[in-house]
Amino acid sequence: MRAGVVAPHRLLPGLVALRRFAAERFPPWATAPMAALLYAAPASLGRPGPLEAAGGALATFLGLLCLRIADDLEDLGHDRLFHPRRGLCFGRIDPARLRDASLALVTALVVLESTSMWRLGFFLGACAFYRAWYGSGRARVHAVVRPFLSNLVFPCAVLHGAGPAAWRASVPLALYAWLVAVAHEFAHNVRSVEEDRSFGPGYARALGTRGTAVLSAALFTGATVAALLLWQMLGRPPAFGTAIAAAGAGLGFFLARLLREPGSRHAGALYRAGILFGLTPALGLLLPR
């Protein structure tokens, strides 16, 4: 059996592992709509046909699932210490079988994406990047730089959805998606230096608690500027502008609380507000303009 090809008799156990993993770590009821939105919003700028749109949304969902699997398999040693109740950590999900399922998904994605050379190019490029990232790249990069590289999947997903006809118009949205994802990562990990030293990613050790909060706020501010650029490019549609203003005001409230009192107490609320803020431009693009 060639490397990278999953034997048929290993597929069924792999599918069981995949189903259990998705239910726990990538619940379709939440992730499928988000993946569809991540594809449909930039795709709306290029107006693809229904079949192409459905294939692109499915590919986005499966691609993000593969990335979630790769991330959890890479962090398995860490998670066994700090998240022992997860299925991968206590044996309910077999890592080898989950890896088999992931390889099968990658094969299916190559077939699915081959209908568009644009999308196939982005998919293969992402595979090459994340293979290098998980292989040795992540360990060589400073902790504060890691979120900027690990979250490149989001601007790539936007450009993947926009297609060759609309990628220029989608650049502000791609920048927005990237900055929000990175800001979200820092906001989620605003904690004390002691907490960070025990189980954190190293942001507080490098920047301090307040420094991590300030960087998160600066990135969210940059994302707001990118959203305003997109609004300008679209011809200033009122509904889109109103949605951005409302989401930005809500996020600003939680950012102010975090900056006033940095720490995990307010980081959770900002994390949830950041999700809504991150989805707003994508939802706004689907409104009548």
Language-model segments: what does each one mean?
Residues 63-108, 179-227:
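Solvent-exposed interhelical
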Residues 5, 12-19, 128-131, 136-139, ...:
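Extended hydrophobic alpha-helices typical of membrane-associated regions
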Residues 11-23, 96-165, 256:
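Intramembrane alpha-helical segments
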Residues 37-70, 82, 121-122, 128, ...:
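Membrane-embedded alpha-helical segments that form the functional core of polytopic membrane enzymes
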Residues 35-44, 104-112, 123-131, 151-158, ...:
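Hydrophobic core of alpha-helical transmembrane segments in multi-pass integral membrane proteins
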Residues 40-58, 107-119, 154-175, 228-239, ...:
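Helix-coil boundary and interhelical linker segments in multi-pass alpha-helical membrane proteins
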Residues 51, 75, 136-142, 165-168, ...:
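Membrane-interface helix-boundary motifs at transmembrane edges
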Residues 33-40, 89-92, 143-164, 204-209, ...:
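Small-residue-rich segments of transmembrane alpha-helices in multi-pass membrane proteins
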